[in-house]
Curated annotation (Swiss-Prot):
Pfam families hit by this protein: EF-hand_7 (PF13499)
Family: Belongs to the calmodulin family.
CDD domains assigned: EFh
Residues annotated for Ca(2+) 1 binding in this entry: 21, 23, 25, 27, 32
InterPro entries linked to this entry: CALM/Myosin/TropC-like, EF-hand-dom_pair, EF_Hand_1_Ca_BS, EF_hand_dom
Keyword tags: Acetylation, Calcium, Metal-binding, Methylation, Repeat
Protein name: Calmodulin
Source organism: Halichondria okadai
Length: 149
């Protein structure tokens, strides 16, 4: 997990970690975690912080060491990336920016990707993703489709 981080990112995280490790003992408290993450441009909710701590704080002592912190940050960044990638992909399909992907928009993008689909195939793709049955795909439906694999 942490091998996906660049040396620069690791150095950045180490610096931030050290700033909040007041007594220099190599651990930060759960309370300090939110402050550290916000200083790195993340914006976790209280529930997310608690979940992250529970995931990495193996002995349940309320403190996190640097390797645990790195694992957690790598995980958090991965989630953010994939969410952003899905949003970007949706924008590519949603040509007119109305928040929906129509059959025509889907056909246009698939054709540009070199996929020659029949109208039936395009309609079938829309039907599979179209949870509320309105004949087009909204962002929530698109996310569900992209993350269901």
């Amino acid at each position: 997990m942490t091998d996906a981080l660049s040396e620069e990112q690791i150095a950045e995280f180490k610096e931030a970690f050290s700033l909040f490790d007041k007594d220099g003992d190599g651990t930060i408290t759960t309370k300090e975690l939110g402050t550290v993450m916000r200083s790195l441009g993340q914006n976790p909710t209280e529930a997310e912080l608690q979940d992250m701590i529970n995931e990495v704080d193996a002995d349940g002592n309320g403190t996190i060491d640097f390797p645990e912190f790195l694992t957690m940050m790598a995980r958090k960044m991965k989630e953010t990336d994939s969410e952003e990638e899905i949003r970007e992909a949706f924008r590519v399909f949603d040509k007119d920016g109305n928040g929906f992907i129509s059959a025509a928009e889907l056909r246009h993008v698939m054709t540009n990707l070199g996929e020659k689909l029949t109208d039936e195939e395009v309609d079938e793709m829309i039907r599979e993703a179209d949870i509320d049955g309105d004949g087009q795909v909204n962002y929530e439906e698109f996310v569900a489709m992209m993350t269901s694999k």
